[in-house]
Amino acid sequence: VARPLWLIDLDNTLYDASWRVMGEINRRMTAFMADRLRLSEQQASHLRERYWRRYGATLLGLMRHHEINPYEFLYQTHPHHDLHHFVPASRGARYRVSRLAGERWLLTNASRRYALKLLQLLGLKRCFDRVIAIEDMKISGRFRPKPSMLLMRRLLRQSGRPAGRIRLIDDHDENLQAAHRLGMRTARVLASKTVRMQARDSGRPLAARRPSYVRLQVHCLRSLIRAQHFR
């Protein structure tokens, strides 16, 4: 029987990115778009979110509608040299991730440079057998980040495993839905306290609902470890 393969998201899954880093990335994206597209800050922020919701990544909307250079965008908007200012201390993260039995691939729509630096800061670089960042998500010359079904099918082929031996760990419903449609096992990790509080305040607490495409729902990696043999 093939060992399980874990496809693990980065921000708001491995750690609580809402602490500071996601706000900083969004701020830099908004500033970049305001400058390049000659928009007000409010217009740029609205467009950033609209592209993210429509395409799964703001970058795809900018490439499709404005011919933005993807590598320049990623370089300008993802912290690197100063990333340590925006990432909370993560005690025991290496121990917890290493206890997930099987092969582990990091799967993130963020840039490779950002992902590798963040793994280093979290002490998780040696915990992953492979890192798949947005630069690695080109198919037939076009970027196909999560939740692209083309990407998910390619990962399934590359894994050499039946879909039932692959487990996607993510915080976004669209990504979990795509994996579920292919027969992969899915777990939603609600690591962001900010997101949980916003959902609770809106009257729709995340913990109170588990969609059919989510096999397991937990608040942290520690809980995932205890339930890692979910089916």
Regions found by a protein language model. Give the residues of each.
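N-terminal helical cap/lid subdomain that shapes the substrate entry/recognition surface
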Residues: 2-8, 13-92, 113
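Conserved phosphate-coupling serine/threonine residues in phosphotransfer and NTP-handling enzymes
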Residues: 108-110
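Catalytic-core regions built around general acid/base machinery
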Residues: 92-101
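Short glycine/serine/threonine/alanine-rich loop segments
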Residues: 39, 68, 102, 161, ...
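Short, surface-exposed loop/turn motifs that are enriched in glycine and acidic residues
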Residues: 83, 104-105, 141-145
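Asp-based, Mg2+/Mn2+-dependent phosphohydrolase catalytic module
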Residues: 1-3, 98, 112, 116-231
